[in-house]
């Protein structure tokens, strides 16, 4: 089954939005298989955003992600990467659909409350950065048979 990496950024944690955002994934039938509240250090932040090194927003993004705890999660489900992208909405909350996570909670392009993998390959890379294999739970979710064929 496909997995994706989701991070609730410092603004989501500080504003007390964690439960509301998790509920959106659960309501859509996604299965939570890994989660941790953690502080991101410089090395991990730079690894996570390595593809943006050299861009003007790289350093501010690294500093921001280190400014307060984040919630790192792994979700599983059918086409979960695309589903998560739809739930999150456009990166800039001003362009996000009303009702999407960023449309509902995002303040601006920097403080948009959530990060999600943009592809299966990115999900694999990001999951490996934040979780050891033994930290992910393999289980059958009650009612799972009602959520996909």
From Swiss-Prot:
Highest taxon of source: Bacteria
Record GO cellular component, one term: cytoplasm
InterPro entries (UniProt xref): NDK-like_dom, NDK-like_dom_sf, Nucleoside_diP_kinase, Nucleoside_diP_kinase_AS
Catalyzed chemical reaction(s): a 2'-deoxyribonucleoside 5'-diphosphate + ATP = a 2'-deoxyribonucleoside 5'-triphosphate + ADP; a ribonucleoside 5'-diphosphate + ATP = a ribonucleoside 5'-triphosphate + ADP
Subcellular location as annotated: Cytoplasm
Pfam families listed in its UniProt record: NDK (PF00334)
Catalytic residue list: 115
Predominant subcellular localization, coarse grouping: cytoplasm
Essential cofactor(s): Mg(2+)
GO biological process: CTP biosynthetic process; GTP biosynthetic process; UTP biosynthetic process
GO molecular function, one term: nucleoside diphosphate kinase activity
Coiled coil residues, start to end: none
Ligand binding (ATP): 9, 57, 85, 91, 102, 112
Keywords, in A-Z order: ATP-binding, Cytoplasm, Kinase, Magnesium, Metal-binding, Nucleotide metabolism, Nucleotide-binding, Phosphoprotein, Transferase
EC number: 2.7.4.6
PROSITE patterns linked: NDPK, NDPK_LIKE
PANTHER family the UniProt entry points to: NUCLEOSIDE DIPHOSPHATE KINASE (PTHR11349)
Assigned protein family: Belongs to the NDK family.
Subunit structure: Homotetramer.
Biological role stated in the UniProt entry: Major role in the synthesis of nucleoside triphosphates other than ATP. The ATP gamma phosphate is transferred to the NDP beta phosphate via a ping-pong mechanism, using a phosphorylated active-site intermediate.
UniProt protein name: Nucleoside diphosphate kinase
Gene that encodes the chain: ndk
């Amino acid at each position: 089954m496909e997995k994706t990496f989701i991070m609730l950024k410092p603004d989501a944690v500080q504003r007390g939005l964690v439960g509301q955002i998790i509920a959106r994934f659960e309501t859509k039938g996604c299965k939570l298989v890994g989660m941790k509240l953690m502080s991101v250090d410089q090395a991990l932040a730079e690894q996570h955003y390595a593809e943006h090194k050299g861009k003007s927003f790289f350093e501010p993004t690294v500093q921001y992600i280190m400014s307060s705890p984040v919630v790192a999660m792994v979700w599983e489900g059918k086409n979960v990467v695309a589903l998560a992208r739809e739930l999150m909405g456009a990166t800039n909350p001003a362009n996000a659909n009303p009702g999407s996570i960023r449309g509902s909670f995002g303040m601006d392009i920097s403080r948009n409350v959530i990060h999600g993998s943009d592809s299966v390959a990115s999900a694999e890379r990001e999951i490996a950065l934040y979780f050891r294999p033994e930290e992910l739970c393999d289980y059958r979710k009650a009612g799972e048979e009602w959520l996909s064929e």
